[in-house]
């Protein structure tokens, strides 16, 4: 999100480092996988469940990435950077929880019925 990008920019500023923006091959792969789901599964509960699962893969990747950055910032004593990174980490965890609730509140059951 824009807020997350702003926080990364703040971390870079606080630490006084230059950041070269690069594309993340892993994230591009997850996005491509989502596109394949859309192209290969008809609209309906099964596709919805697959897309929720794909979105959770993205969130888990982001949680792992921000968790690692938080651990490094803590180890290095970068308290301002840690605060900003933790905020984003908590947002990612919250999004993952919402996706889990969406799947468990009927999305997976509807997909299972459709697949049966």
Give residue ranges: language-model regions:
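Amphipathic alpha-helical hairpins
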Residues: 1-116
């Amino acid at each position: 999100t824009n807020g997350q990008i702003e926080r990364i920019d703040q971390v870079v500023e606080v630490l006084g480092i230059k950041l070269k923006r690069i594309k993340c091959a892993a994230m591009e792969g997850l996005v491509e996988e989502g596109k394949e789901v859309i192209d290969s599964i008809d609209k309906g509960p099964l596709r919805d469940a697959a897309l929720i699962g794909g979105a959770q893969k993205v969130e888990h990747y982001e949680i792992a990435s921000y968790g690692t950055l938080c651990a490094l910032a803590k180890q290095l004593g970068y308290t301002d950077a840690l605060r900003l990174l933790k905020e984003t980490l908590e947002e990612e965890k919250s999004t993952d929880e919402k996706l889990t609730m969406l799947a468990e509140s009927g999305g997976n059951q509807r997909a299972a019925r459709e697949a049966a």
